[in-house]
Amino acid sequence: MIQFLQGQVVTVTKNIQNRWFLILSVNGVGYELQVPHSLAQQWTPPPPEPQQVFTHLLVRQDQIALFGFGRLAERDLFGQLMGVTGIGAQLAIALIETLGLEGLVQAVVTGNVKQLCQTPGVGKKGAERLALELKTKLSQWHKLQMGTGETDSTLPTTALLEDLEMTLLALGYTQTEIQQAIAMVSQVPDVAQSEDPEVWIRQAIGWLSDH
């Protein structure tokens, strides 16, 4: 299996179905990869220096496709999503595009169906199934990604999370900024053990102010 490719980004394009592709030249061979919108934006225009892309090769009876990601964790999460009943490659990449790595893991682990439904093509039943099938797996996977052993970040409950998101959105922060802040402050022991929304809000605002 191809784990990653390293080469020159030649072109970045969007097709009529709003899917993003890039051509990566590796030792004289041009590889076409479908990539998330965020990576396409990052490499538009194509950077002059060689780039590394983590890949997932999809082989089906009627299709062979290569998907590319800027982060190894994104590639691994894509593979996890593909194992869920009813989640194909396009819906998996849409989930990553819409919620981002941290936001998607957080939504699944906390069972935040409302947040998962923000992704086009994901309904309530699909979101519930996604959370049900992946909650335990992603909790364990998240611990490994964080590189910790016995201790790890603890994500807020769904109700607390909704209060936190609404407050930060009202203060003008974007969904991406909010997801990043929650992922970071959830690693602070005093915050992780608290069920007080004010504690989470104060820490999140503090982190956002410094970044």
Curated annotation (Swiss-Prot):
<dbReference type="GO" id="GO:0009378">
    <property type="term" value="F:four-way junction helicase activity"/>
</dbReference>
<dbReference type="GO" id="GO:0005524">
    <property type="term" value="F:ATP binding"/>
</dbReference>
<dbReference type="InterPro" id="IPR000085">
    <property type="entry name" value="RuvA"/>
</dbReference>
<comment type="similarity">
    <text>Belongs to the RuvA family.</text>
</comment>
<dbReference type="InterPro" id="IPR011114">
    <property type="entry name" value="RuvA_C"/>
</dbReference>
<feature type="region of interest" description="Flexible linker">
    <location>
        <begin position="150"/>
        <end position="158"/>
    </location>
</feature>
<dbReference type="Pfam" id="PF14520">
    <property type="entry name" value="HHH_5"/>
</dbReference>
<comment type="function">
    <text>The RuvA-RuvB-RuvC complex processes Holliday junction (HJ) DNA during genetic recombination and DNA repair, while the RuvA-RuvB complex plays an important role in the rescue of blocked DNA replication forks via replication fork reversal (RFR). RuvA specifically binds to HJ cruciform DNA, conferring on it an open structure. The RuvB hexamer acts as an ATP-dependent pump, pulling dsDNA into and through the RuvAB complex. HJ branch migration allows RuvC to scan DNA until it finds its consensus sequence, where it cleaves and resolves the cruciform DNA.</text>
</comment>
<dbReference type="Pfam" id="PF01330">
    <property type="entry name" value="RuvA_N"/>
</dbReference>
<keyword id="KW-0238">DNA-binding</keyword>
<feature type="region of interest" description="Domain III">
    <location>
        <begin position="158"/>
        <end position="211"/>
    </location>
</feature>
<protein>
    <recommendedName>
        <fullName>Holliday junction branch migration complex subunit RuvA</fullName>
    </recommendedName>
</protein>
<keyword id="KW-0227">DNA damage</keyword>
<dbReference type="InterPro" id="IPR010994">
    <property type="entry name" value="RuvA_2-like"/>
</dbReference>
<comment type="subunit">
    <text>Homotetramer. Forms an RuvA(8)-RuvB(12)-Holliday junction (HJ) complex. HJ DNA is sandwiched between 2 RuvA tetramers; dsDNA enters through RuvA and exits via RuvB. An RuvB hexamer assembles on each DNA strand where it exits the tetramer. Each RuvB hexamer is contacted by two RuvA subunits (via domain III) on 2 adjacent RuvB subunits; this complex drives branch migration. In the full resolvosome a probable DNA-RuvA(4)-RuvB(12)-RuvC(2) complex forms which resolves the HJ.</text>
</comment>
<keyword id="KW-0233">DNA recombination</keyword>
<dbReference type="GO" id="GO:0006281">
    <property type="term" value="P:DNA repair"/>
</dbReference>
<dbReference type="Pfam" id="PF07499">
    <property type="entry name" value="RuvA_C"/>
</dbReference>
<keyword id="KW-0963">Cytoplasm</keyword>
<dbReference type="GO" id="GO:0005737">
    <property type="term" value="C:cytoplasm"/>
</dbReference>
<dbReference type="GO" id="GO:0006310">
    <property type="term" value="P:DNA recombination"/>
</dbReference>
<dbReference type="InterPro" id="IPR003583">
    <property type="entry name" value="Hlx-hairpin-Hlx_DNA-bd_motif"/>
</dbReference>
<dbReference type="GO" id="GO:0009379">
    <property type="term" value="C:Holliday junction helicase complex"/>
</dbReference>
<dbReference type="GO" id="GO:0048476">
    <property type="term" value="C:Holliday junction resolvase complex"/>
</dbReference>
<feature type="region of interest" description="Domain II">
    <location>
        <begin position="71"/>
        <end position="149"/>
    </location>
</feature>
<dbReference type="InterPro" id="IPR013849">
    <property type="entry name" value="DNA_helicase_Holl-junc_RuvA_I"/>
</dbReference>
<dbReference type="InterPro" id="IPR012340">
    <property type="entry name" value="NA-bd_OB-fold"/>
</dbReference>
<keyword id="KW-0234">DNA repair</keyword>
<dbReference type="GO" id="GO:0000400">
    <property type="term" value="F:four-way junction DNA binding"/>
</dbReference>
<feature type="region of interest" description="Domain I">
    <location>
        <begin position="1"/>
        <end position="70"/>
    </location>
</feature>
<dbReference type="GO" id="GO:0009432">
    <property type="term" value="P:SOS response"/>
</dbReference>
